[in-house]
């Protein structure tokens, strides 16, 4: 991991006390407000050079948003994803990947349409959702993905 990746930070306003906090893209555990100590929404951007450090090695489940600047549905679903990250502060990390800036990641994860959402658990894809959806649908999908066993723990039907 380069020093640039380790030093990259996002400013997040605490939904509990309103204090602005600098949250690193890469860290162990979950970010907490420096003022009130509540868990903060963890939202980061990643590209080809730092995706492994930011998303695949995260200590909590990661909701990955593959999006593009020219994509209308991507812009429509972005506030819903940020809402989910806020609702599940300390439980998930939201990582946004611009497919035009990271085409190799799009190929690697077989992204054929944007937006496409993935849930990574232990660095493995646990769930996939293509296309925009209302926040209630995304919330249910995310909750299902978070409650299922890890891909490596899934048992074959008998």
Predicted regions and their residues:
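A short beta-strand-turn-helix
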Residues: 44-62
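Thiol-based oxidoreductase modules, predominantly thioredoxin-like and allied folds used
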Residues: 46, 66, 78-104, 111
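Short linker/helix segments within small regulatory modules
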Residues: 22-32
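Non-catalytic, surface beta->alpha helical segment in thiol-disulfide oxidoreductase systems
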Residues: 113, 118-155
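Short pre-active-site segment immediately N-terminal to redox-active cysteine/selenocysteine motifs
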Residues: 59, 66-70, 113
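Short cysteine-rich clusters marking metal-coordination/redox-active sites
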Residues: 14-17, 33-36, 74
């Amino acid at each position: 991991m380069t020093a640039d990746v380790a030093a990259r930070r996002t400013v997040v306003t605490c939904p509990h006390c309103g204090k602005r906090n600098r949250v690193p893209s890469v860290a162990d555990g979950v970010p907490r407000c420096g003022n009130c100590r509540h868990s903060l929404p963890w939202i980061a951007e990643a590209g080809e050079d730092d995706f492994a450090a930011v998303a695949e090695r995260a200590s909590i489940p990661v909701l990955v948003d593959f999006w593009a600047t020219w994509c209308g549905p991507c812009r429509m679903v972005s506030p819903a994803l940020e809402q989910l990250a806020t609702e599940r502060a300390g439980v998930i990390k939201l990582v946004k990947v611009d497919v035009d800036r990271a085409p190799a990641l799009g190929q690697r994860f077989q992204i054929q349409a944007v937006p496409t959402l993935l849930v990574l658990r232990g660095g493995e894809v646990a769930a996939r959702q293509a296309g925009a959806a209302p926040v209630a649908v995304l919330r249910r999908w995310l909750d299902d993905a978070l409650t299922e066993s890890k891909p490596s723990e899934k048992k074959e039907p008998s």
